[in-house]
Amino acid sequence: MTTIVSVRRNNQVVIAGDGQVSLGNTVMKGNAKKVRRLYHNKVLAGFAGSTADAFTLFERFEAKLEMHQGHLMRAAVEMAKDWRSDKVLRKLEALLAVADAESSLIITGNGDVVQPENDLIAIGSGGAFAQSAATALLENTDLSALEIAEKSLTIAGNICVFTNQFKTIEELKY
């Protein structure tokens, strides 16, 4: 699978992801970019799960952002409604982590939209490791959101066999 982590601190939000694509127990690619900018570079998004499914979701989510003039929460809720009602979308196996200057959200394969506590998101196979590391760093250091995301992703990559050390990191300052 993968690991995606999003951290918000001091007028900065970051989404970071590793680059491993696995098929069963085989690493197929080590430098995949699972994090990108959407809607005029104002929204960050990362995915965990099936790569093909995630690209479908990125396209649909970006269309929802355009339709709702970049309003993240509204686009996420509309995307979730579609996900629940569309037979094709319901079969997609992916999670999206999305963030803008105001909100951080998880959009699940069940069509749920979750705004996590402390604006900390960690999804994918290494998500629990990254979340633990990021929580400890948020509570006990003055590191920036970028530094916390990078360090927590490194820790997850050291523990989770489906997460590697190649990182794609996107940041918004506001």
From Swiss-Prot:
The keyword Signal does not apply. Allosterically activated by HslU binding. Na(+) binds at residues 157, 160, 163. It comes from the Bacteria. A double ring-shaped homohexamer of HslV is capped on each side by a ring-shaped HslU homohexamer. The assembly of the HslU/HslV complex is dependent on binding of ATP. HAMAP family: HslV. Protease subunit of a proteasome-like degradation complex believed to be a general protein degrading machinery. This is ATP-dependent protease subunit HslV. It comes from Shewanella pealeana (strain ATCC 700345 / ANG-SQ1).
